[in-house]
Amino acid sequence: MSYFARLPEQFVPPLLLETELLNALYGAARQQHDDVEIAATPGEDVAIRATFIRWFLLGAIPASQIPIARVRITGATIDGVLVLRGARLIVRLCFQLCRFTAPIDLTEATVPGFELIGGAIPAIHADRLTVRGSLLIRAADPAGKDGTEIKIAGAIRLNGATIRGNFDMQGAHLGAELAEQRGYLAPLAVAPVYCSHDPATPEARLAAQRRPNAEDGTREPAIDGRAWVALEADGLSVDGHLRCVWPFHAKGELRLDGCRIGRNLDCAGARLENFGGYTLSAAGARIAGTAYFGSPFHEHADDSHHGRNPQFVSRGTARLDGARVEGDLDCSDGCFFATAFLTGWNTVSPFENDAYALRANGVEVGANARFAGRFIAHGNVTLLNARIGRDLDFTSARLEFAGGEALCCDGIAVAGLVMLLGGQRPFWTNGLLRFVLASIGQGIYAENVRFDRSGPPAPLTQHAFLTEDKRFAKFAVPSELWLTDPLWTAHDRKEIVRHACGIYADDAAITGSFIWRDVAGEPANGSPSYPFWLHLSGASAETVDDDIKSWAEPDRFDIANCRYRSLAGLFEGYRFDEGEDHPKAFASYVKSRLSLLDREYAPRRAERSSLKLGGLALPPRPRKACSRYEAIRRFKPQPYLQLARVLRIAGMDKEANKVLARLESNRTRYGGFYWPNRLLRGFTFGFLLNYGFGWPRPAIVLLIWASISSVAFQIARSQHLIEPTWHNKENLAAKPDRESNPPYVPFNAPIFALDTLVPLVNLDQKENWEVEPMSHHMVEAGTRPFSWRDYRTYSGLLSSAPDRLVGWLIIFNKFFGWLLTSLFAGGVTGLLRGGREPAELPGGE
């Protein structure tokens, strides 16, 4: 049996829709329905008082004892503030295409479910709300048809709320409030910016935020660093999905700090705007499923489907610091704009967050982090100290931060791959990609990549250096990449170039492969605005899979103390032409790598030659581009040692020796030696011994010089400048039949030359023949034999110069012979071999 509460006097007489609502309750009692539904008729009175709805929900329905499950009101205008603070409802509320003149207050209420389908409302205050079912604040038409969206002028407050089902805001249009303001209306000065739903451009809205400064007449941000919030839901708990999908649109911050989502956070196709602030803040959030910030159908979309596959768009800073996503972090097809990259950005009083397009420091992703497809970021994307359970995918992405840091992944740990790959389009960036101290489990794949330096540096980086603003210094390239080079300045003025693009991955640990293929710097022809760098100092990888052309693209690279175990291009990856002689091909391959190393670490040597490999021909850089002091500063031996070690492990000892010989040659030139030491080292160890790898050279030089000397000695003998020694003359006068006399030793010019050159070996020539000037005034005939240790012999020759050239030649041969034989012995034994590569991966020099 049903009982009906008496209508309070304040509602007498009831309005038209109020009467229909009471009649629907009576009808449900008679027909035993569990739904109470009414719909306004256009042209009639569509108003219904909020206080009446409160009495109806908390008084009439409980008193009737009818098991009503849902109350649905369509097309009505709710007049006044609907206050349900602390209420415990037993029915699910549904307002479809209704217009509220004041906010709804659901603070600390408990409801089975709550639905706002289409319509308009100033604000929703529902802190600590408990919803045993789902909370739906969504458009009536999922396709976003005009007139079916839900418009909320102010903010939705759900701090500490609990939703047992889904929280669905598909197609909702949210305005914003000041975070510290408890009212629902924004200030009149900025209300048209955040609370209107006209299709104004972001630039127009940004300009509308600015007001004149009374002191200097300039324009500064009207927000003054204050936080504008569209959804304030710190500590929100949602057991199901949280959906803000297309055509969702918010003009303030979606604040989800510390929230817990049991399934997915889906923002596919959403548009978020908060110039100078956060568009989304989910710091410390816990998401058990996947977080989507892309397009609804990115896996099957291309540019031809752009109209029906909208991108996620964020104009401001999206923040995920410290968040944990158990599934994927999927930003594929997303479009992120930092405030500093929007037209009209104010450089008078900027904020630090103006440079961030996406900030996810310390984020933990259980599966893949995807930034693929049509993903584009205008500003800095930072994943500092992030943890990725599988792959970090930037396939076909575009990262724009001209001359500054477009991507910061310092300290990141990726269990799978880092993919900088081209798909339907190349991976493109005009900024720097940082992976300092990163830990990559399966490798970095950089293939089909374009680094563009055609445009000017970003205004933010120019502002940072012109004003020395320390807030933006972190977004500039490291000082290690600055260049003092006339190639990058006008009229050959040597200025410091503080902008660059490329990859900066010092001390990165790559367990798998580092792939560097099909990489190009743009523009290919013309004058770039800033250099293209590849900085891998101290990094390590198991395998390097590359092509020579890609290494030749960067203007500068640094692989000092870089460690790797193998080069995939030696056998599998490097494809030789059919019928090509493999030893010659290997020699050409290694020569090309040496030329690349010389361009970076021996630049003055590389200036005199061109790098050629197949169809590749790079002209030498002008000599004025690098001074000797700069060449000495840039020289580093470790890259040569590492290459030699890898070649030797691969069984290419001959090529490894060539690399080490080139290293020692460069060490002689750029090791900081003074010019006499350079000349002496270059002649003795370089020319005569090839730094220990040409040990036959001293013997060959000795034989060649012996041949030249033999000609000179033969001429001297014919002119009687070389005569027998005194005991050899006695043998001439002795009787030949006397057995006690030694036999006569005839003169032999080649043997005499060798006898003067080779030490510690007696060939019976220099003991039996002497230079004629040495037999007068210095040695008394018949008294003693000639001794090479007698200093008077040399002083006599010096006093008789220059007509004693044959004697000078003998002295030179003596010293030269000692030098050549010592070098020969040192080369054979390996004592004088230079550039010994380590047996294990070096830790650095």
Whereabouts are the PLM-identified features?
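Short, well-ordered loop/turn and helix-capping segments at boundaries between secondary-structure elements
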Residues: 649, 665, 717-718, 834
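Membrane-proximal N-terminal segments immediately preceding the first transmembrane helix
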Residues: 673-686, 786-798
